Amino acid sequence: MELIPNLPDDVARECLLRSSYQQFPVIASVCRAWNREVSLSQFLHQRKASRHSQELLILSQARVDPAGSGKIIATPEYRISVLESGSGLWTELPPIPGQTKGLPLFCRLVSVGSDLIVLGGLDPITWQAHDSVFVFSFLTSKWRVGATMPGVRRSFFGCASDSDRTVLVAGGHNEEKCALTSAMVYDVSEDKWTFLPDMARERDECKAVFHAGRFHVIGGYATEEQGQFSKTAESFDVSTWEWGPLTEDFLDDTGDTVSPPTCVAGGDLYACWGGDVMMFLNDKWQKVGQIPADVYNVTYVAVRPGMLIVIGNGKALAGYGEATVGYICDLSSSRWVKLETHGGHVQAGCFLEV
């Protein structure tokens, strides 16, 4: 059966490749052949290779009072905002079914293929830890419930994705506020969790990135340290299924008291702290830029080809409804361009290319 009557399939496929991601659910509903075509992993690879893919900045963001009162909300309601970087268009994802009070507070967001994964967090009413996993498909524009996180209910854990198939989780604390050494991996396609060997030390409020085939867990603090963030890091090699040796002074040059927002791109590791953009070069951190002065408390940082994206909150005493501040930096010229942003405090974010 032809994809489009009276057109060669390669021409019809080119038409589908040029479609906006927002049209995918409609395309998939037209017929089985189109549904099958856009569901293939090769379809996404071809979109990227032909430069028809769209880059989406996805944020967990507090809903702003529509009346514009400017009041600080004691327990804000969070939703998922999406920026299509090519057009500058902001949209919102449909709410997660059954989550009438918005997203779990402090949940983690990661992307795997064309899916957005929402993990854990705290119940907005009871503040009890969630072990929930929700998966949003940008191909169908629908949510599904994933397998719950096994073991103790944890919050404030480090989380990263290999961008292809799996999500890795480490550290955080349990419901007794005890920091954890445990780690695990979620296979999105199989909807299955598997425990990893434990880390060398407890890591509450740690940061995590996936880089060069390794899951890196950075900073955090042990139960007895309570907020005294470690400068150490350790990495898990997914090919050998082993943790490497502890790196004692990985963050020794930061001068910061928390684990800084960190990201990876093109084999390079970046972090933001103290108003500076830092890059890990030759086994040490080096300053490569300065964050614009009106960005307070960086909540998310990402690097894309040739550019750095920084999202933060605007003022030191800002309420949850305060306008988010975002910038894109051209890495070749170090020039910052301000983003048009939604209002509302940002807790988490991720990038997805579809």
UniProtKB/Swiss-Prot annotation:
Pfam families: F-box, Kelch_1. Transmembrane segments: none annotated. Kelch repeats lie at residues 63-110, 115-163, 166-213, 215-263. One of its GO terms (cellular component) is SCF ubiquitin ligase complex. Residues 2-49 form the F-box domain. Keywords: Kelch repeat, Repeat. This is F-box/kelch-repeat protein At1g80440. GO terms for biological process: negative regulation of cytokinin-activated signaling pathway; regulation of phenylpropanoid metabolic process. InterPro entries: F-box-like_dom_sf (IPR036047), F-box_dom (IPR001810), Kelch-typ_b-propeller (IPR015915), Kelch_1 (IPR006652), KMD1-4 (IPR044595). It comes from the Eukaryota.
